[in-house]
Amino acid sequence: MAEYTHYFIQYNLTDIFYEDVNIEKYSCSICYESVYKKEIYQCKEIHWFCKTCWAESLFKKKECMICRCIVKSISELSRNRFIEQDFLNIKVNCPNSFKYIDENKNNNNKIKDLENGCKDIITIGEIEKHLKQCKFTHIKCKFIGCNKIIRLNQVEKHEKEQCEFRLEYCRYCDTDGITSRSLENHYKECPKFIVKCSENGCTVQLERSQLESHIEKQCQMVMIDCPYKIYGCEQSNRFPKSNLTQHLSSINHTLAMGSMIESQSLQIKETNIKYENLLNKINKLEQLETESKCDQLYDKFYQFESKIDKKLNNLQLDLYPKDNQQPQQKEQKEQKEQKEQQERIKFDDLFEKVSKVNSYFINGCLLKYKNRWSISNYLTESRKYRKITSPSFKIYDKKFKLVIYPQGKDDGSYTSLFLKSDSINPIKVFYKFVLLNFKDESKNLIFKNKSIMDKEKSVGCHYFIKSTEPGKKPEVWLKDDSLVIDFSIEVNINNDIKPLES
């Protein structure tokens, strides 16, 4: 059962008496409180008071407060259970017979709920037990957002039928947790809600999410224009899509069709011209970008070269003094040798920088490309196909791909690996293949070379690895049945290599 917050009505016993009762008859004559939940003691003269009042009186004076008979302690008094029990047997109404007034938290103004209140008549002694099981007690609705106070025997109806904050389930889209007050709005937007086609005359019912597609592609009642209207069709008014066949057969559209074909041909021609212009612009931009990069690298190279020449001249002046100068002292000679050593170090640094820049220039700009080729299900693929080709990739405007022959291109005992290009001109390439060893990285299989890709348009290694190795040692050369090859390529894009002819 769900946990509820209970709201109990605050009451005095006089509020719930079923019949008129003289409450003074059951009240302590010292504190004037009723004997409810109190122990009543009496002296030998039958003068009774509550235990609390007896204790306070005897603390001050050892005598009865009325007859003054000697009473040394409460233990000398007798319990008056008759008055206690007589009070507990008084008949009362259940406190839940009243309305719970939310605005009056203390319920000072008791209003009998004749229609929905508890009708039980009980005794004062039965009040606590009765309230624990009374079905008319007041509780707060369990749903978040609802602040209504209802009776326990009405909670099921309220939560299932009346509460606006009860959680509902959309039977169309399987969404739950929707409050009852929001369900109607949800139905107005639910993509799975069944709706009728909005086109006049169409009786199709379908999910809201399919409505747009239905109207666009399937609905026969949607109003359309003749497809040849802009090319001269006589029919100017729109008509249902279902009438299109009848319209096309009833009117001769030959002239309109000819006009349409001519118009579309012109559009295609204009599109092709725009495409060619855009392609030329792209090629020019790529060429300008490459030339700009090359110019920048050349500038750096000449700057470094100029610095080196200047340093060399300075060194030469210092190391070879003029003939008319006097011989230097020993100390000055040592200083000059030390200075020479420092200049040599600086020279070496500059030379190294120039070498790095110069590495970018081999008859033009050198572009570098690195990547990894992972061949899934290698053992299965190698038995199934003579060759396996990688996805193609571009370096500048040249397209390349890797091709592996698991059983060799020429010799079946060795696997072959090649780099191929679709370039129509010779290309100078520097390439490196690395077959990963998953047991020991230091034992990776490496092949590198530099070649000119001419008419063959492919370079590589015929004897890369024994064709049986991956199958014999899968734990070494395969990872999750994948053969992995790292490769790097350097391409000279501005070379003017021409094949020799004789």
Swiss-Prot record:
GO cellular component assignments: cytoplasm
Protein location: Cytoplasm
Parts forming coiled coils: 261-295
Cysteine-cysteine disulfides: none
Zinc finger (RING-type): 28-68
Pfam families for this protein: MATH_2 (PF22486), zf-TRAF (PF02176)
GO molecular function: nucleic acid binding; nucleotide binding; zinc ion binding
Main location: cytoplasm
PANTHER family listed in its UniProt record: RING FINGER PROTEIN DG17-RELATED, TNF RECEPTOR ASSOCIATED FACTOR
Zinc finger intervals, TRAF-type: 129-183, 185-243
Family indicated by similarity: Belongs to the TNF receptor-associated factor family. A subfamily.
Known function: Probable adapter protein and signal transducer that links members of the tumor necrosis factor receptor family to different signaling pathways by association with the receptor cytoplasmic domain and kinases.
SUPFAM superfamilies membership: RING/U-box, TRAF domain-like
Protein name: TNF receptor-associated factor family protein DDB_G0268444
Domains: entry comment: The MATH/TRAF domain binds to receptor cytoplasmic domains.
Domain MATH, chain residue ranges per copy: 368-489
